[in-house]
A protein has these predicted regions:
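Conserved catalytic loops of ABC-family nucleotide-binding domains
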Residues: 69-80, 86
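Conserved catalytic segment of ABC-fold P-loop ATPases
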Residues: 88-94, 114-115
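ABC ATPase "signature
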Residues: 103-104
Length: 130
């Protein structure tokens, strides 16, 4: 969950008491702590709902890598607005207004789903040939 660095740097390290509502940590730190708590349970299924929205892209990348390698046998359902959060998924479901508009892998959706392609371009600034 990429939490060790900032937790270790706290005055009391892993013995630090968090304030009510976690007001003594940032939004991204709260998200990483929530992910860490979920991982401690070693779940068979892990549902992450926009769980890295307050985390910088470099940390998000490290979290994705750790989830892939450390939880290889865990089914992960990731709800995200950032395409980078899901582009390596086995399957991506694109939704708009509560309706499924596309299902597939990243490369397939880039070619076949205009909505997915537009989101990708807006988030990365990279043009794509359909």
């Amino acid at each position: 969950a990429q939490a060790n660095g900032f937790v270790s740097a706290m005055k009391d390290g892993y013995d630090t008491v968090l304030d009510q509502g976690g007001t003594n940590v940032s939004g991204g730190q709260k998200q990483r702590l929530c992910i860490a708590r979920a991982l401690l349970k070693k779940p068979k299924i892990l549902i992450l709902d926009d769980s890295t929205s307050a985390v910088d892209t470099a940390t998000e990348s490290r979290i994705r890598t750790a989830l892939k390698t450390d939880l290889a046998g865990t089914t992960k359902i990731i709800i995200a607005q950032r395409i980078s959060s899901v582009m390596d998924a086995d399957e991506i479901i694109v939704m708009s207004d509560g309706r499924i508009t596309g299902i597939g892998k990243h490369d397939e959706l880039i070619r076949s789903n205009e909505e997915y392609r537009e989101i990708y371009i807006s988030q990365t600034g990279k043009e794509v040939d359909a």
